[in-house]
A protein has these predicted regions:
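Flexible glycine/serine/alanine-rich "lid" or loop that lines and gates the nucleotide-sugar donor pocket
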Residues: 83
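Conserved two-lobed SF2 helicase motor
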Residues: 63-79, 91
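C-terminal helicase lobe and adjacent C-terminal extensions/tails of nucleic-acid helicase motors
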Residues: 1-9, 14, 18-53, 58-62, ...
Length: 206
């Protein structure tokens, strides 16, 4: 990791703890923070206050408040009401409306002209989705724990509406313009109309 403030949102506490341990070993434990719903309220509130101080709108590289290198690993608490801003984000697969909400934590605040205060490689908002263990022709096999919180059918809809239907697939979203359109596509149409045909038996059984 060359620098930047990266968020990692996991669907379960166990996945968050595991990710934080791996990242701590790779990046250095001083660069990794963990927050999730099992923290005692007083500890979680203190943690969230520190995150706002480090990653909120008033924290900049110029005033020395925004760190040059930080990874924040958490559960859904990171998508809820925290006014924080990441240079890039990786998230477990989730229903489409939550994916859009999480995406709103990336480049939430302007960081210099043309985002010049961000690392060069992260000046374009970048968002990674994980939680698919295998891409089978009949549908995705979700990683253990990734489908324990949300219905597998909703996760398949989320991937399909974003056109992420194969390993290495990517899509581009314009925020906030695309949020309403993407959510409407996921919830306002018959999923059989946008899901890959080969996924339909697995989807109907989910």
């Amino acid at each position: 990791m060359d620098g930047g403030c990266i968020g990692v949102i996991c669907d379960t506490v166990g996945r968050a703890q595991h990710a934080a341990e791996l990242l701590g070993n790779h990046c250095g434990r001083d660069c990794v923070r963990l927050t999730h719903s099992r923290f005692m309220d007083i500890d979680r509130m203190s943690n969230e206050r520190e995150l706002r101080d480090l990653l909120g709108p008033d924290a900049t590289i110029g005033n020395g408040k925004r760190p040059g290198k930080l990874v924040v690993v958490g559960t859904q608490v990171l998508e809820q009401s925290l006014d924080i801003d990441f240079d890039a984000l990786e998230t477990d697969i989730a229903p489409d409306d939550l994916i859009m909400q999480r995406l709103g934590r990336v480049h939430r605040h302007r960081r210099g002209d043309g985002e010049c205060d961000r690392p060069v490689s992260l000046q374009t908002a970048t968002f990674y989705i994980r939680g698919v263990e295998a891409w089978n022709k009949e549908g995705p096999k979700f990683s253990r724990g990734a489908d324990s919180v949300y219905d597998a059918a909703a996760l398949m809809e989320s991937l399909a509406v974003l056109d992420l239907t194969a390993a290495g697939a990517s899509c581009a979203q314009q925020l906030p313009q695309d949020i309403a359109r993407t959510v409407r596509s996921a919830y306002g149409n018959d999923p059989h109309g946008f899901l890959p045909h080969m996924w339909l038996p697995q989807y109907d059984d989910a």
